[in-house]
UniProtKB/Swiss-Prot annotation:
Keywords: Chromatin regulator, Nucleus, Repeat, Repressor, Transcription, Transcription regulation, WD repeat. Its main location: nucleus. This is Polycomb protein EED. Transmembrane segments: none annotated. It comes from Gallus gallus (Chicken).
């Protein structure tokens, strides 16, 4: 799956093995990345641009006449007006492997006053950086997988519930989840279970030990990293029929929405009596006190499913309150909810066939797959990069969804596909990572 574009991914090798040594990099001050990497002229060109009229796009489910059971909300067009958020490009650097960087995540678990740390993943490399004032990006640590064929696609931060140490989970083409402790600079655990590549990792918003992974093997898995147990597998009879590309917990961690190459989005409840008991039992399980293996739950039936939102691979999904934001390779992020507008999402039945589309965030030149959007911690901003290096930032603090405001961020030297973006917890910094192994830092102007 090295080529993540319009063509379906090639088969990836799976299997365990290989230690993952840490490489502590010490850079001299002149080697450190600093704002001097961008000349004054380039800095002048790195600006926030007000978006004009939205680019029209090909027919998709979001702008064709309503399909049966689909309700449209208003005109369904999110017009771009001047966004109140402005950013300036203050730094960029390029990792030496030259391969696409597929993932980036700031550590949102740090305390106030702690350095702003983010991780990038690409090739067989995991790299940690620290953001300093005046635009500096300082290299902290770099980890290399022993297998040169590993290609990391995704990462997620959590913390050790006993020591409060930050922990970073990473996974990719080989289907192995690795847990890295940056304090001890070691890969402390690894999990093998998925039969193929892992496309996304997510930690539960209220339980730092519950890790969700989604895979090319058509399934989602929920792990307890404190007791090293596989709590549940979501998939099978009514599960995804192709690669699962993305998933997200809702704010309370009671529901999961997943999406994939089968064009579908599926809702899985983890606050059912069955799942609550399974999670409780995963904490009580001690392999030293029993010979029996932990029994993982097999969840074959989602609590809601639809294919009425997109007509192509659905490669990113996020909860926004009780609403869903999802995108495909169709130049639009769609805002929608299961059922009718007045329906309570917690009472939606698996047989429900209605969906309500509230609107769209339109953009252009983003019709390859595995391009993921992000929101800031408070869900006030939404950011997405396209395949020619443009960044779109929308203001989500709006009453009328049809008046979404957008800023386009461009730099003359940022021309490669932006695979993922990440905001610092205080929303002061936006990092974008690209197909040419470049990292771009945009600082918010107050």
């Amino acid at each position: 799956m090295s080529e993540r574009g319009e063509a379906p991914a090639a088969a990836a090798s799976a299997g365990a093995g290989g230690e993952m040594p840490a490489k502590k990099q010490k850079l001299s001050s002149d080697e450190n990345s600093n704002p001097g990497d961008l000349s004054g002229d380039e800095n002048d060109d790195a600006v926030s641009i007000e978006s004009g009229t939205n680019t029209e796009r090909p027919d998709t489910p979001t702008n064709t006449p309503n399909a049966p059971g689909r309700k449209s909300w208003g005109k369904g067009k999110w017009k771009s007006k001047k966004c109140k958020y402005s950013f300036k490009c203050v730094n960029s650097l390029k990792e030496d492997h030259g391969q696409p960087l597929f993932g980036v995540q700031f550590n949102w678990h740090s305390k106030e006053g702690d350095p702003l740390v983010f991780a990038t993943v690409g090739s067989n490399r995991v790299t940690l950086y620290e953001c300093h004032s005046q635009g500096e990006i300082r290299l902290l640590q770099s980890y290399v997988d022993a297998d040169a064929d590993e290609n990391f696609y995704t990462c997620a931060w959590t913390y050790d519930s006993n020591t409060s140490h930050p922990l970073l989970a990473v996974a990719g083409s080989r289907g192995i989840i690795r847990i890295i402790n940056p304090i001890t600079m070691q890969c402390i655990k690894h999990y093998v279970g998925h039969g193929n590549a892992i496309n996304e990792l997510k930690f539960h918003p209220r339980d730092p030990n519950l890790l969700l992974s989604v895979s090319k093997d058509h399934a989602l898995r929920l792990w307890n990293i404190q007791t090293d147990t596989l709590v549940a597998i979501f998939g099978g009879v009514e599960g995804h029929r192709d690669e699962v590309l993305s998933a997200d917990y809702d704010l309370l961690g009671e529901k999961i929405m997943s999406c994939g190459m089968d064009h579908s989005l599926k809702l899985w409840r983890i606050n059912s009596k069955r799942m609550i008991n399974a999670i409780k039992e995963s904490y009580e399980y001690n392999p030293n006190k029993t010979n029996r293996p932990f029994i993982s739950q097999k969840i074959h039936f989602p609590d809601f499913s639809t294919r009425d939102i997109h007509r192509n691979y659905v490669d990113c999904v996020r909860w926004l309150g009780d609403l869903i934001l999802s995108k495909s390779c169709e130049n639009a992020i769609v805002c929608w909810k299961p059922g009718k507008m007045e329906d309570d999402i917690d009472k939606i039945k698996p047989s429900e066939s209605n969906v309500t589309i509230l609107g769209r965030f339109d953009y252009s030149q983003c019709d390859i797959w595995y391009m993921r959007f992000s929101m800031d911690f408070w869900q006030k901003m939404l950011a997405l990069g396209n395949q020619v290096g443009k960044l779109y930032v929308w203001d989500l603090e709006i009453e009328d969804p049809h008046k979404a405001k957008c800023t386009t961020l461009t730099h003359p030297k940022c021309v490669a596909a932006i695979r993922q973006t990440s905001f610092s917890r205080d929303s002061s910094i936006l990092i974008a990572v690209c197909d040419d192994a470049s990292i771009w830092r945009w600082d918010r102007l107050r």
